[in-house]
Amino acid sequence: MNKNNVIDSLFNIIEDRKDKPIEGSYTGYLFEKGLDKILKKVGEESSEVIIAAKNEDKEELIKEICDLTYHIMVLMVEKQIKLDGIEKELEKRREKICNKKNERKTIERL
């Protein structure tokens, strides 16, 4: 399966679980519990990514990055952020990747 298709498919499933909850669904559980629970999971998974990277366990790191990615996608759906919005922002930033630090524009707002 194409890489983007896996991500798109997962995102679509997450959106579907928000719109049409299924009993026993972990994704549905997260949406039911709300933003605070979702943010807690994003924080936990972020910490687990850091620990796995520090332990230099590549397989565990891959698994933790997948967990974090999933929870970030749940957060995106909760906050009504689409994948194409992220893609557009990354595309804008890609233009700056090769710039040297002194060549970058000053950030005017955060």
Swiss-Prot record:
GO molecular function, one term: phosphoribosyl-ATP diphosphatase activity
Domain of life the protein comes from: Bacteria
EC number: 3.6.1.31
Pathway involvement of the protein, from the record: Amino-acid biosynthesis; L-histidine biosynthesis; L-histidine from 5-phospho-alpha-D-ribose 1-diphosphate: step 2/9
Any one Pfam family match given in the protein's UniProt record, by short name: PRA-PH
Primary localisation category: cytoplasm
One record GO biological process: L-histidine biosynthetic process
Keywords: Amino-acid biosynthesis, ATP-binding, Cytoplasm, Histidine biosynthesis, Hydrolase, Nucleotide-binding
KW Hydrolase (keyword) present: yes
Enzyme class: hydrolase
Subcellular location per the Swiss-Prot or TrEMBL entry: Cytoplasm
One GO term describing the cellular component: cytoplasm
UniProt-listed InterPro entries: HisE, PRib-ATP_PPHydrolase-like
Catalysed reactions, as listed in the record: 1-(5-phospho-beta-D-ribosyl)-ATP + H2O = 1-(5-phospho-beta-D-ribosyl)-5'-AMP + diphosphate + H(+)
UniProt keyword ATP-binding, yes or no: yes
Cross-referenced HAMAP family: HisE
Family to which this protein belongs: Belongs to the PRA-PH family.
Protein name (Swiss-Prot/TrEMBL): Phosphoribosyl-ATP pyrophosphatase
Species this protein is from: Clostridium botulinum (strain Okra / Type B1)
Source species taxonomy: Bacteria, Bacillati, Bacillota, Clostridia, Eubacteriales
